[in-house]
Amino acid sequence: MEFVLFMGEEEGLLGSKSYVKQALRDKSINKIRFMLNYDMTNDPKGYSATTDASKSLFLAIGGLAQSIDTSFRNSFRSGAGLHSDHQPFMLQGVPTGGAGGGSLPNNAGPCYHADCDDFKLVDEKGMQNTVRFNAMLVYGLADAPAIEAKRLTDQETKDLLLKSNLKEPLQIAGEWRWKD
């Protein structure tokens, strides 16, 4: 289990890209079983992953979370997306996931990345739930006898990105590495 804080997300995922570049170089990428990303997570109501491969495991962990606190709805969402620190991992086929489904508190949305952003916009209970429910996910993954999600091959990664309509945005960003 490794906890990492990345810098430079807003400047182009600088920290996570650097991490993945080094992990490819030293082959440690092969040891990464899951990259759980927590960006704009508040009072999550369920878990998410890039693919459905670990849906049953995530729902089992979520069921335990829900039995402790019924505000956790134990929803599951799968899909590939861009523009957060999971992206460099996903582009290398590493399973990614996290939690979500909550909403930003205190009308914080308009202040995201704006001058009006302020610590008073943070909701303490939502932050506590973020930590609790995500700690349950991390513990559940670490304690699982098996994790169905495996690192995707290069072709499987390409297919996932095509299915998710991410080729064009990745081409625009200069990050589509496959030859057609």
Label each residue range with its predicted role.
Residues 1-2, 107-180:
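His/Asp/Glu-rich mid-to-C-terminal helical/loop segments that flank catalytic regions of hydrolases
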Residues 6-109, 175-178:
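Metal-dependent peptidase/peptidase-like ectodomains
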